[in-house]
A protein has these predicted regions:
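Flexible glycine-/small-residue-rich
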Residues: 114-118, 126-128, 140, 158, ...
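N-terminal "pre-motor" subdomain/linker immediately upstream of P-loop NTPase catalytic cores
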Residues: 75-79, 85-184
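Phosphate-interacting basic helix/loop segments used at nucleotide- and nucleic-acid interfaces
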Residues: 99-110, 211-215, 303-308, 357
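Charged, low-complexity terminal tails
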Residues: 1-107, 120, 129, 134
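P-loop NTPase catalytic core
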Residues: 237, 246-249, 258-280, 284-479
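Short flexible coil/turn linkers enriched for glycine and charged/polar residues
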Residues: 106-108, 116-120, 130-132, 148-152, ...
Length: 479
């Protein structure tokens, strides 16, 4: 069939796809049209086979019932047949039962994330949110009837109706995102929820926590629904800071669903984070630097949809992403050229999806929140990275700025306290904390950056917790 489609022109393929109801054909290339047609052929073949199996089973049941009713009473008292005839019948029954067992296997339990395709059908993915050999087909009728969406975690039963089927089909659905199927059908769409400013604080400070967490907790407080950026030069400690935030969240908020998304990252960093951050509600999703840009793009989109589905169930979700800059680079290589180019070779169209991802962070009035903390790279020697940062600069409502000059002087954490901060932090800090931060920021005026940070770090080191630090600042009226 592939050869037949490939022999046709793109215009003819487009007409065929249009007549079959395939969406988004105007932007597809010939190879994409061929794949879409083949995918629909496979989906239709699977549906047809499922219907045939159901009809065959119903017909067999009816025939058995009729034969049982019409059987004469004397037949039940008939003597045993000759041994050779009995042997032949037994052999025939065994052959039929063997064929039936290979044709329709026993249902198996399946669990994974749903990806709905353009043509309406879907697949349950299992490994790292990406296609694999053990994916499960979900029929369009099931998706429409149960209001299923990309990003839903489905638990149910599957089986192959034919040995030649590439994928098993979903036969029974038990839960959607851990909730009853009926609840999923009645949920409100993410886009219809009302976003408000973060007003519930996520405290990163805990007994025995590092100075970095104590500083971030006061200088750039994080609330549920925050959209924050960790701006860093190379080797300034952004990944370490992200890891410490993840540890604090898993310890203090075990019910919060934490997704760590690593894009274009080193494989050893992925292993380190997976082993360091563990919990019942923790997912580490990754796409290492040796993968194609399309792989980065697909993984990030699945993570975004997964988080939205959880928020629709009024869950609190946090995504820690490293990094938004590398995601923008991946989209710059995959989007169709718009004909315009910014400094550094960046296509403006490449920023749409990264902004959509980052902009999904919000606190919902109806309940639930999506918090996103993403790292952004600056001063890498690439003009494109600086342009990406400038484009995202005003979109967040919280920033932590790391300075490599401080780290080179062995000042850790290398946080530029003067430039870091949170919008509307009055909704998150109490009066004593606000007053102490005002005193601290006023005292930094006129001081060199490294001197000010060292002085503040010294004071943090001589206090056991933030409460003690605030009391000391308010008492002395200086830091």
């Amino acid at each position: 069939m592939r050869e037949k489609y490939e022999s046709l022109s793109a215009a003819v393929l487009r007409e065929l796809a249009k007549s079959r109801g395939i969406k988004g054909i105007s932007s597809m290339k010939k190879s994409q049209l061929v794949e879409a047609m083949l995918a629909q052929d496979e989906a239709e073949a699977t549906e047809t086979k499922m219907e045939e199996v159901e009809k065959k089973e119903e017909h067999t049941k009816e025939r058995t019932t009729v034969a049982h009713r019409n059987r004469p009473a004397s037949e039940g008292r008939r003597e045993h047949r000759p041994s050779n005839e009995h042997h032949d019948n037994t052999r025939t029954e065994r052959t039929e039962s063997t064929a039936d067992s290979s044709y329709a296997e026993e249902p198996k339990r399946c669990e994974g994330i749903l990806e709905v395709m353009q043509d309406g059908f879907g697949f349950i993915r299992s490994d790292n949110y990406l296609p694999g050999d053990h994916d499960v087909y979900v029929a369009p009728a099931q998706i429409r009837r149960l209001n299923l969406k990309t990003g839903d975690i489905l638990v149910g039963k599957t089986k192959r109706n034919n040995p030649t089927d590439k994928f098993g089909a979903l036969m029974q659905l038990d839960t959607v995102n851990g909730f009853a199927v009926e609840e999923a059908a009645k949920r409100t769409n993410f886009e219809d929820l009302t976003p408000i400013f973060p007003n519930q604080r996520i405290r990163l400070e805990q007994p025995g926590s590092s100075v970095a967490m104590r500083i971030v907790d006061l200088v750039s407080p994080i609330g549920k629904g925050q959209r924050g950026m960790i701006v860093s030069q190379p080797k300034a400690g952004k990944t370490t800071l992200l890891k410490e935030i993840a540890k604090s969240v898993t310890t203090s908020y075990p019910d919060m669903h934490l997704i760590i998304l690593l894009i274009d990252e080193r494989p050893e960093e992925v292993t380190d984070i997976r082993e360091a951050i563990q919990g019942d509600n923790v997912e580490v999703i990754y796409s290492t630097f040796d993968e194609l840009p399309e792989h980065h793009k697909r993984v990030s989109e699945m993570v975004m949809e997964r988080a939205k589905r959880l928020v629709e169930h009024k869950k609190d979700v946090m995504i820690l992403m490293d990094s938004i800059t590398r995601l923008a680079r991946a989209y710059n290589l995959t989007v169709p050229p718009s004909g315009r180019t910014l400094s550094g070779g960046l296509d403006p169209a490449a920023l749409h999806m990264p902004k959509k991802f980052f902009g999904a962070a919000r606190n919902m009035r109806e309940g639930g929140s999506l918090t996103i903390l993403a790292t952004a790279l600056v001063d890498t020697g690439s003009k494109m990275d600086d342009v990406v940062f400038e484009e995202f600069k005003g979109t967040g409502n919280m920033e932590v700025i790391l300075d490599r000059k401080l780290s080179e002087k062995r000042v850790f954490p290398a946080i530029d306290i003067a430039k870091s901060g949170t919008r509307r932090d009055d909704l998150l800090l109490n009066k004593e904390e606000q007053e102490a931060m005002e005193i601290m920021r006023r005292g930094m005026n006129g001081m060199r950056k490294d001197e000010a940070v060292e002085s503040i770090l010294n004071m943090f080191a001589h206090t056991r917790n933030n409460k003690e630090y605030i009391a000391k600042v308010l008492r002395s009226r200086m830091f």
